[in-house]
Amino acid sequence: MARLHSLVFLGVLASVPAPSLAQSTQPTPSPTSEASSGSEWSIKPRGRIQVDVADINAPATVAGDNFGTEAEIRRAYLGVDGTLPGNLGFRVEADFAGEFADESVQFTDVYLTYKPTDELTLTLGQHKPFFGLEEQTSDLFTSMLERAAFTSAFGFERRIGLSGAYSRGDLLVQAGAFTVHTADLDADDDSYGFDGRVVFSPKLGVGELHIGGSAHLRELKGSDAGTVRYRARPFAHTTDTRLVDTGSIAANGERSFGAELAYIAGPFHATLEGHRITALRPGLPNSSFWGGYAEVGMLLTPGDKTGYRGGTYDRIRPADPVTEGGIGAVQVNARYDRLDLNDGAITGGLQQTLGLGVVWVPVDSLRFQANYGRLWISDAAIPAGTDRDYRVDTLGVRAQFDF
């Protein structure tokens, strides 16, 4: 069955016309299917594939799997966007990457939208709660191969829920109530939560300022009741080993807050983001952990601008793509990332990362990335012999295509 799903995905992907170097980089009109004489019915295929190769160089005495050089299909999405009469829209999309590793296909976005006004959008189904700037930014447009360590450590994921987003001028307000991921529907998981985010993005000088904050409250029920766990990979996804890990913590809920600050001016961007999560522990002192990152980046190619729209980073569109005899867009980025999983008697470890990256975008739909990371691990969950303080180096590259 896994092989069948993989062949279906590859067959559909192969049917999508590849961008020719002789073609313009202007988007091709979306294929539509119309009912009767109206134009409100439409359907548009969408997808992406990301292929990663990463090398993780950890001390030889650290016990872990898939260190050294490994390759993986990081994401292989296939789905459709559509519109319906009455200001309705929908998206159905699944990730087939697991099929290449004998795992299951998982739904990503599966939702229905309704726009009663130009400013308000209501969404019902599985989509992202509003955790913060980098988590809301599509993985197609992130500056590093992997998002900040806290986004995975704190369990940020898509969930089934009902939300609303109000956007007017420089203000964006998002809020919703969410349950669980579709993969957990059969796991007797009755957890639910409430998430909200506010972004103010006024013009400032020659650029745009981004100021945001988010708040989250989650009640753990069913199979998730009683424990939480926070852990993170070492700046690469090719291993399942986490060098920082709190282990299971008795808790019946979570409360967290995030803060976002960014400035985008032409080819330049700077970002500062942090998130603090508290495990709510009945009869015991609550435990709090936090993570954050600071980043600067610059597009080196003339005429190129950092993409930003709707409270998130967006696609880089080369001013001089290879289809017109240029070299595309080249961006360099530097980041400091910190994840602290120590609090009181709980010692999950401290992971600090200095990341350097380069992004090459030859045309809108193609992207190549390379990252180097130097990690400093303190109080590691997995020691190097008897030493719980050590360093790790990672190097990763990605080839990406989307339509």
Predicted feature locations:
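Outer membrane beta-barrel
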Residues: P27-A58, A63-K221, L261, Y293-E324, ...
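Hydrophobic helical h-region of N-terminal Sec-dependent signal peptides
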Residues: F9-L13
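Bacterial N-terminal signal peptides that target proteins for export
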Residues: M1-V8
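Outer-membrane beta-barrel pore domains
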Residues: T25, G38, N57, G64-D65, ...
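C-terminal intrinsically disordered extensions
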Residues: M1, V199-K203, G212, L220, ...
